[in-house]
A protein has these predicted regions:
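Structure-specific DNA junction-binding interface
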Residues: 1-113
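C-terminal accessory module of base-excision DNA glycosylases/AP lyases that mediates lesion recognition
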Residues: 1-42, 116-125, 133-286
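Short alpha-helix boundary/capping elements
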Residues: 53-61, 77, 129, 181, ...
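Generic hydrophobic/packing signal
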Residues: 96-99, 125-132
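Aromatic-anchored, charged helix-turn/loop surface patch used as a conserved interaction hotspot
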Residues: 104-105, 122-128
């Protein structure tokens, strides 16, 4: 029965968004997710640095990642690690001497964005430096892709290895570099899934599993499912000429009525997947 709900929610979410932005524009966004792949360590490290800043208002304090290129040796994680090691204060002071970022730089404030970023940048470089090439990194990633229970273990590893990169940001990093088995369990996705009672709590792992399951029953990539829910929740299409505003309240109310109707239908003789004894095979892809 839950699979039927997940199927209905995704299909209606896509139609809901198509009405707001147009099918062509939506497909353009989704096609980028399906096809974009990083293929070198420089772009990989750039995306890692960007992912670290993708929370609250941190990016406004750090500024453009591109403006930091000279401090990270053209975004070479190996050279960055060789030069700084894990000495985040050295990096912090070098940036402060060489650039005036948009946000304050206070080396004595443990939780300040620049302290968090400096620590995350160097622990991220240290992690990537374990791989001699992008091909070696890719092979490591693929070790986690053979089963749906293994897929979320990878962001758990990144969460432990890279300072300031929690589970959602690790998922964000992986999806943005082209690993489409990953969706980010952010506040907008959580609001929608919780609002529709498709998850029992806002736990990152539980939300991630539900995104993965929703993708499987719809024969879609988890990253695409994530993007559609995010666009509805945030209203941020990425095109300044298109403003739709946050639509999650409207969508949730519409879907509640449809899910109630589905419950009535299933309760009058139609069986869900679980009642029929059917299982959707777990294994592979966001």
């Amino acid at each position: 029965m839950k699979d039927e709900k997940l199927r209905l929610v995704y299909q209606d979410a896509k139609r809901f968004l198509e009405k707001l932005v147009g099918k062509e524009i939506l497909e353009e966004k989704l096609e980028h997710i399906r096809t974009y792949k990083v293929n070198n360590m420089y772009d990989l490290y750039w995306h890692l640095l960007l992912a670290i800043t993708n929370k609250r208002n941190m990016s406004q304090s750090i500024g453009s990642i591109d403006d930091l290129v000279r401090f990270f040796f053209d975004f070479d994680p190996h050279k960055t690690h060789q030069h700084y090691g894990l000495d985040w204060k050295r990096l912090f002071r070098r940036v402060k001497r060489g650039r005036t970022p948009p946000g304050p730089m206070d080396i004595g404030k443990e939780g300040s964005y620049w302290v968090v970023f400096s620590k995350g940048a160097l622990s991220g470089a240290a992690f990537l430096a374990n791989f001699d090439s992008f091909q070696a990194f890719h092979a490591f990633i693929m070790c986690f892709q053979d089963h749906d229970f293994a897929i979320p273990a990878l962001p758990m590893v990144l969460e432990r290895e890279i300072y300031g990169m929690g589970f959602p940001l690790a998922c964000d990093f992986l999806k943005e570099v082209g690993y489409t088995n990953y969706g980010k369990p952010d506040v907008h996705v959580k609001d929608i899934l919780c609002g529709l009672e498709l998850v029992d709590c806002r736990d990152n792992y539980e939300v991630f599993k539900t995104l993965l399951r929703m993708a499987r029953v719809n024969n879609e990539l988890p990253a695409v499912v994530d993007k559609i829910l995010y666009l509805i929740g945030s209203g941020n299409i990425g095109k300044p000429e298109i403003k739709i505003g946050r639509q999650k309240k409207v969508f949730i109310e519409e879907m509640k009525a449809k899910l109630a109707e589905l419950n009535r239908h299933l309760g009058h003789g139609s069986c869900g997947d679980e009642e029929q004894g059917h299982e959707n095979t777990e294994g592979e892809t966001r």
